[in-house]
Swiss-Prot record:
One GO location term (cellular component): membrane
Predominant localisation class: membrane
Protein name (database record): Putative uncharacterized protein YER190C-A
Keywords, ordered alphabetically: Membrane, Signal, Transmembrane, Transmembrane helix
Domain of life, per lineage: Eukaryota
Signal peptide: 1-17
UniProt miscellaneous comment: Completely overlaps YRF1-2.
Residues covered by region (Disordered): 82-148
Topology versus the membrane: Single-pass membrane protein
Annotated compartments: Membrane
Native species: Saccharomyces cerevisiae (strain ATCC 204508 / S288c)
């Protein structure tokens, strides 16, 4: 009888010691996130429509990046400027249709990231070049309607968390560990 109680206690203890999360519809993963429609991530963000990203932003329509700005025809960016057709900002030059800048340049209706620009027309920059409707950054680049993440991204519709696989593994392990104890307890009970 004590063995049965012990095996049940082991099984429950292993289950309680496992935290599990699952994601359906869209997912957020530690450090990396990607979505179609909108997405939030710490470090890298990509979206088609709008997104918020810390450090780096991927642009397909409009986006907001901490320390960079929001761009959709016109925008205001911390330390950069406001853009509608054309703009002038300290240490940054941009025309309407094309731009050349030592650091960052942006055309009409496009966007700027730290050392990275997306341009409606054409531009030249020492760091990164991008066409209309897409952007490339030193870390992650994504076009409109798709996203690429430097680590792992959960896609819309279904999201599978690695902790779900961990939970299945723990359940199997708990069953294996408790099976011999349960079998011995049953044999002793029959005696």
């Amino acid at each position: 009888m004590e063995s049965i109680i012990l095996s049940i206690a082991i099984f429950i203890g292993v289950l309680l010691g496992t935290s599990v999360g699952t994601f359906s519809g869209s997912g957020i993963s530690a450090g990396v996130g990607a979505s179609s429609g909108s997405g939030i991530s710490a470090g890298v963000g990509a979206s088609s429509g709008s997104s918020t990203s810390v450090g780096v932003g991927t642009f397909g329509g409009s986006s907001t990046s901490v320390g960079v700005g929001t761009f959709g025809g016109s925008s205001t960016s911390v330390g950069v400027g406001t853009f509608s057709g054309s703009r002038t900002s300290p240490d940054v030059d941009a025309g309407s249709g094309s731009s050349t800048s030592p650091d960052v340049g942006a055309g009409s209706g496009s966007s700027i990231s730290a050392g990275v620009g997306t341009f409606s027309g054409s531009r030249t920059s020492p760091d990164v070049d991008a066409g209309s409707g897409s952007s490339t950054s030193p870390d992650v680049g994504a076009g409109s309607g798709s996203s690429i993440s430097a680590g792992v991204g959960s896609r819309i519709g279904t999201g599978i968390s690695t902790t779900m696989n961990a939970r299945v593994a723990v359940l199997i392990t708990a069953a294996i560990l408790s099976a011999p104890v349960t079998a011995i307890a049953l044999l002793e009970a029959r005696r």
